[in-house]
Amino acid sequence: MAETESCTFHVPSLEEICSILKSGLLKNFADVNVIVTECPDLTKEPFEFPVKGLCGKSRIADVGGVPYLVPMPRLDKVYNVNTVAKKIGLPGAYILGAGATSHRSLGMNAELIFSVQAESTSTLAVNKSYVASVNPGDGSCLLEKYRDRNNDNDFGLLSNLYACEGKPGKVIEVSVKRRIGQDNFVSCMRKSLKEHYGENAVGMGGTFLIKQGKAKLHVMPREYSACPLNTDEDVNGWLKFYDMTAPLICQSVFVSHDPGYDLRLEHTHCYSHHGEGGHYHYDTTPDTVEYLGYFHPAEFLYRIDKPSATHLVGRD
């Protein structure tokens, strides 16, 4: 795996982050409640994580990047969760987030929804990740458990990951209803932090539920585009978009400011227990939507295998 760069994030207190998020969310949602609380047991439904919490030595890893997918895919870009955990100094880490599958592993392109505890010196990896692909039969979304497809812990091209020891502890609980603004849930929180902290980059990771309503998600086709995808319009024409139904469980990573590492500032992938999942864009039912999330700031940023030639296409 290629070069790794790292830096420290600005880490405000949980109480201070609560205050900043609340003031920003109130501009975008009619009902807002943001508090510091004990992380719920995430091994329980609907999350079913392999660990109980989001705490302990928190960090964010931005691996690869969109330039390895578009304009043309770099199928040689294959990464491994266990290797990433070691590179970020946290073997055995719990890792959540959003990325792409390895074509070498699955023989297709698909969305990867990360929920995996990396291997340690004494334990094997516990991979509870999901894969969302386009059903070749009818074009619908097909959601599968990663372990039903493959026993490895690889991924490809790009990912945005939050890693921690998976311990219980204090987290930020965000509960909002009825969207009255234009920003999606994650963008609103990210922009709130950016407005307050400026170039002091704050990184956040966590999980949230879309409890009520519907949301626009996309799933990448199984086959990579035969033609170069040179613009956002090209990319959107290639992707498959869906209106998906709550409840959705969403794994999210966002950073308030890019301190010069060519970061993807936000990336969220969702899964469900009713067969739907993919890349989150925004809710489509503002009057009835309801979100409930649990988040924790990251202490460190790791940038792994940053593309040398970059662009801003396909980063929504």
UniProtKB/Swiss-Prot annotation:
Q: Which SUPFAM superfamilies match?
A: AF0104/ALDC/Ptd012-like
Where in the cell is the protein located? Nucleus; Cytoplasm
Annotated GO biological process: DNA damage response; regulation of DNA repair
Q: Where do the annotations place Zn(2+) binding? A: H267, H269, H279
- Which cofactors, if any, are listed as required? Zn(2+)
Q: List the record's Gene Ontology CC terms alphabetically.
A: cytoplasm; nucleus
| Top EC category | hydrolase
Instruction: Enumerate the GO terms in the molecular function aspect.
Output: hydrolase activity, acting on ester bonds; zinc ion binding
List its EC numbers.
3.1.-.-
> What keywords would UniProt list here?
Cytoplasm, Hydrolase, Metal-binding, Nucleus, Zinc
Q: Which InterPro entries match?
A: C11orf54_DUF1907
- Subunit structure, briefly? Monomer.
This chain's function reads: Exhibits ester hydrolase activity on the substrate p-nitrophenyl acetate, in vitro. May regulate DNA damage and repair by regulating HIF1A degradation via chaperone-mediated autophagy (CMA).
PANTHER family the UniProt entry points to: ESTER HYDROLASE C11ORF54, PTD012 PROTEIN
The protein's name in its UniProt record: Ester hydrolase C11orf54 homolog
Its source organism is Xenopus laevis (African clawed frog)
